[in-house]
Structures are given as structure tokens and as C-alpha cells.
């Protein structure tokens, strides 16, 4: 039986980089699992330490829901693509682990499944965690540095003829040295057509793909309207969504209506006045609001590509972006910590906003406490609190 062709017929028309092979399969007992840092439909991501080398890694479990299905195609696609890509802002897979199923009978061989893990460098934070953590403040030079690195990574991906198709805050990671890593290539695909060029619009757009990609809250309007010959512009919308997330200090821009494909829906944008620039100018400044408007342009043909965005004045006006190594060390913050951070933020807000009693009432209460502490409750206090006891 031949293995599945994850790139369809792309090898005939697109230059594909050779895949670096894994030297060998590791074993799970070679690692000390520390804690869970992520969870989703794919399985669980755990922080672990290599017992021999001592370095921290992330173990991503690949769930296979049925032994009859074989190796998950999304996982195979992600691993294959990541082995082809080599860029400082793209997460690397350093190895694989396969845990054999525990079989006691021949029937178990059919029903039981082995478990695969990918081994990647440990990333101390993702942007959902950083945005939700009340103890973390991402200032303008820091966010410019993060955004610049994100755009450099996306530009590299697009120049290699790939669509990521799931750019969102949870898939943008930060290592302890301040280097951004783009992760989760399970939805990535090779695209056909021209590459993105400065001032020339997006790349691709020559083949049909499913429109059911990109997490819905980050999904661009062309996908909501059912477009199938989409371009690299779908990834750029996700960059703009992240920028609004930072501006609001939240992990998402809010749910958008999932439009039907009826023709009347296409007139919605023609009857509404665009307010994005005026709404975000106080938060991002003139150049930031202008960049955001270029990233969130409704027409994908006019939307900025990564090269255009990197050339924008936002990155050359003060305050300028700092270097990755200048980003201060943050508390470990991941998407899985989001609910804990929300509770912490709510608790902090409640403590800081407890209504204060009126001064006269507070003084009366203080005098009451002083009388009680006197022992017999009869001797009034002296000094500033020696006022008429109007509380009797």
C-alpha cells in the first residue's frame, strides 16, 4: 500500500525542500514529565525534561482515535512540513516518540493503539497566556518586536509556498530568549500561484481548498463567505486579529457572524461605515491604526502581505521595536492557564475596587472597636477619636 500524498500533486509544480529525517525514535521514559501545558483535540502537550541532556522540551501527544485509521493525516502533514521548513521563527520538531500499545491477546493488537509524541524545544509562553496574565504588560516596543518576528516567520512560510491557515494567538509561542515561534501546522498546505511580492498583493489563489479552516474568531471574511480559491491573505488577517487582541488585552477579537453564501450578504460591507481606524487610533497611534487597517482590509487582494507589513512605518517610528534578547523574562503563561488568570484578574479587580465607607462612618466604627478593646466597653478612647458617641 502506498503512503498518502499529503501535498496532492504539488510536487510537479512546486519546488519542495528535502525532508530531514529523524535519526532515531526516542522513548518516553527518557523524559521526566513536569506538567501539562496544553490540551486540544490532538491530545495533550506536556512540559518535560530530557533526563540525559537536562534541557526542557515539549511533548505533544498525537491522538489516533481508531487503530484502523493508521497515523493521523493532519499529524503527518504537520511533521512533514515542519521538517521541510528551517527558520528561526518557526517551531522545529527535534524528534519523535512511539509508545507501543499494551497487548495481552491477539485481539488487543487490533483494538489497542500505540501513542506517538513529537519532541520540540520548550516554549515558556504563548500569546494567549501572555495577554491573559494580569501580571504581564506587553509595552509598545515589546509588541512591535513580537509582531515583527511574527511577520518574518509568516513571510518565510509564504515564500516556501505554504499556507498556515490557523494563525492565532495560541499558535504564536515565545521562548525564554524572546524569540517568536509559529506553531501548529496541522492545517497547513502547499499553495499554487505567484509568491507574495512587495506592493503586489497576496500569493496563491489558483487552486480550490476547503473554507473550513482557521479558528472561527480569527477567520477572514472571504472564508466566512465560502471562498475556496483563497490566498496567503488568510494568514495576514490572523496577524491583524492578534494586533487587536493586544490592543484590548484579550486573546480574541470576539465572535463574528458566520455568513451564508447568499448573494445579498455581499452587500453588507457596502452599507456600513468603516470605523476601525478611529476606534483603534487611541490605542495604537496613527501608524499602528494604519497598519491594522491594511491587515484587516476586507478585500483580500488589497490586504497587506507580510513584506508590505514589515516595510510599514509602524516599525520605524518611536517607540521603536526592541531586540528579542531585550524582551524581559515573563512568568510562564500558556493558553491552559487562561481560566486561572481570569480568576486572578477578577479577584485583583474586586480587591482594588471595594467601595470605601464614608469617613464619618469609618470613624464611628473605629471608636466602637476602641471601646470594645478597652475591656469593659465603658472607657472611651482619647485623642482624635474622642468624639461624641452618637452610635448609642
Where are these regions (language model features)?
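Glycine-rich ATP phosphate-binding loop
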Residues: 44-64
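C-terminal intrinsically disordered, low-complexity extensions immediately downstream
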Residues: 320-391
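Catalytic-loop of the protein kinase fold
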Residues: 158-175
Amino acid at each position: 500500500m502506498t503512503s498518502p500524498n499529503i501535498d496532492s500533486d504539488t510536487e510537479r509544480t512546486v519546488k519542495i525542500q528535502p525532508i530531514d529525517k529523524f535519526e532515531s525514535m526516542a522513548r518516553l521514559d527518557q523524559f521526566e514529565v513536569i506538567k501539562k501545558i496544553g490540551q486540544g483535540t490532538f491530545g495533550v502537550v506536556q512540559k518535560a525534561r530530557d533526563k540525559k541532556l537536562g534541557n526542557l522540551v515539549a511533548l505533544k501527544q498525537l491522538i489516533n482515535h481508531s487503530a484502523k485509521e493508521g497515523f493521523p493525516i493532519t499529524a503527518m502533514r504537520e511533521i512533514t512540513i515542519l521538517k521541510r521548513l528551517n527558520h528561526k521563527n518557526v517551531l522545529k520538531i527535534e524528534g519523535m516518540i512511539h509508545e507501543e500499545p499494551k497487548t495481552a491477546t491477539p485481539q488487543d493488537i487490533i483494538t489497542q493503539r500505540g501513542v506517538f509524541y513529537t519532541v520540540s524545544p520548550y516554549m515558556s509562553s504563548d500569546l494567549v497566556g501572555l495577554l491573559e496574565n494580569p501580571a504581564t504588560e506587553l509595552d509598545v516596543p515589546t509588541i512591535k518586536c513580537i509582531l515583527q518576528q511574527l511577520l518574518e516567520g509568516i513571510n518565510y512560510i509564504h515564500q516556501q509556498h505554504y499556507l498556515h491557515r490557523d494563525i492565532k494567538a495560541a499558535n504564536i509561542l515565545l521562548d525564554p530568549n524572546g524569540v517568536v515561534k509559529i506553531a501548529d501546522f496541522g492545517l497547513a498546505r502547499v499553495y499554487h500561484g505567484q509568491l507574495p511580492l512587495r506592493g503586489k498583493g497576496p500569493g496563491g489563489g489558483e487552486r480550490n481548498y476547503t473554507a473550513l479552516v482557521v479558528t472561527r474568531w480569527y477567520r477572514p471574511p472571504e472564508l466566512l463567505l465560502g471562498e475556496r480559491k483563497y490566498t496567503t491573505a488568510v494568514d495576514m488577517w490572523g496577524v491583524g486579529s492578534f494586533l487587536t487582541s493586544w490592543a484590548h488585552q484579550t486573546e480574541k477579537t470576539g465572535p463574528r457572524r458566520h455568513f451564508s453564501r447568499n448573494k445579498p450578504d455581499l452587500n453588507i460591507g457596502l452599507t456600513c461605515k468603516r470605523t476601525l481606524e478611529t476606534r483603534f487610533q487611541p490605542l495604537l497611534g496613527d501608524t499602528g491604526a494604519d497598519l491594522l487597517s491594511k491587515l484587516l482590509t476586507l478585500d483580500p487582494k488589497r490586504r497587506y502581505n507580510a513584506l508590505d507589513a514589515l516595510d510599514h512605518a509602524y516599525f520605524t517610528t518611536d517607540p521603536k521595536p526592541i531586540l528579542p534578547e531585550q524582551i524581559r523574562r515573563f512568568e510562564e503563561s500558556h493558553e491552559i492557564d487562561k481560566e486561572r488568570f481570569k480568576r486572578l484578574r477578577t479577584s485583583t479587580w474586586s480587591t482594588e475596587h471595594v467601595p470605601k465607607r464614608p469617613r464619618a462612618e469609618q470613624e464611628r466604627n473605629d471608636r466602637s472597636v476602641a471601646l470594645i478593646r478597652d475591656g469593659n466597653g465603658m472607657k472611651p478612647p482619647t485623642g482624635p477619636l474622642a468624639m461624641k458617641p452618637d452610635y448609642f
